[in-house]
Amino acid sequence: MAGRLHVEVRLQDGVIRAVDTRLQRPLPQISRLLVGQTAEAALRRLPLLFGLCAAAQQVAALRALERAAGWAAIAEVEEGRTRLGELESIRESLLRLVQVWELPVPLERLKALLALCRRAAARLQALTAFRAAPLPADAELEGTLAALAAAWADLQPPAPADWLRPRLDRWQEVALGGPPPQAFTADELPALLAQLRASDARAEIAGQPRLGGPAASAGAQATASAQIEQHVGALLRRTAQAIDSLQSPPAPPAVAGLAAGEGVGLARTARGWLLHRVCLDDGAVGTWQLLAPTDWNFHADGPLRRRLCGVRVAAGEVEALLRELILALDPCVAFEVKIVHA
């Protein structure tokens, strides 16, 4: 099911006076399709509902459902699932870097990297079963992961400024406004969980937006040029970190204080942490909530509004600037922009 992002900017006398960010996501419809299903049936439906980050959606859902059912996957299973999510993140990040940001990678090398990701993911697919058993030692998987790490090391991608300079120079004189929201941290999970239990699934903490993933690590830069460069650099660094983590996958953040029949699952995507919360009632789904990185990064009071309000930019440049900044924040849905001249 596809969502859509709408961003409207009001420009007056060469200054951005207002930014309206509206993210439309079919989360209530998705929830209705899953409520009433058994865990196994819900997991069979998930791949039909999500295109991007499909593996991460599956992993987060599995973790939530198994926790709600009172079953804890052993460390080897969790490590394999984390690897599966990271392989998807690597693949999606590479495609984004090449297709959107024109990372200069020879086509044959890109194809080889993507093929290694697919081959390794196929060896881990059995772990997407509910209450999956650990996989036997797999020399082919380990060899594929080693080949992926070697291929990435051999690639030696340049710094974003080296290949993006003509694209960035256009925005060197555009000074951005106030600071973006704070980054979401694992310490805030209890507060978020309390909100979700109260049927408040907004991507905020105590009424305040947060940032996640590469968007959070990019920081607040003075100019639009520097901000875009840092976002692309953060995505590049995240890709390298994901490849490194395949050798020793980290455990997902622990979620304490869950009630009987309640489960929360987290999975890292190319854009940040994905969260599913599930409640089971007599073995059937009673509640299903999810928050994705795009929900956080495109909050109505998020980085677009905070960084763009009050910014001076030529009328003929504002749409192109807006599109570049949206692409830098990397939404997982299609978007459209509208410029209103006051």
UniProtKB/Swiss-Prot annotation:
The lineage of its organism: Bacteria, Pseudomonadati, Pseudomonadota, Gammaproteobacteria, Pseudomonadales. It holds the Pfam family NiFeSe_Hases. PANTHER family: HYDROGENASE EXPRESSION_FORMATION PROTEIN HUPK, HYDROGENASE-2 LARGE CHAIN. The gene is hupK. Belongs to the HupK family. GO terms for molecular function: nickel cation binding. This is Hydrogenase expression/formation protein HupK.
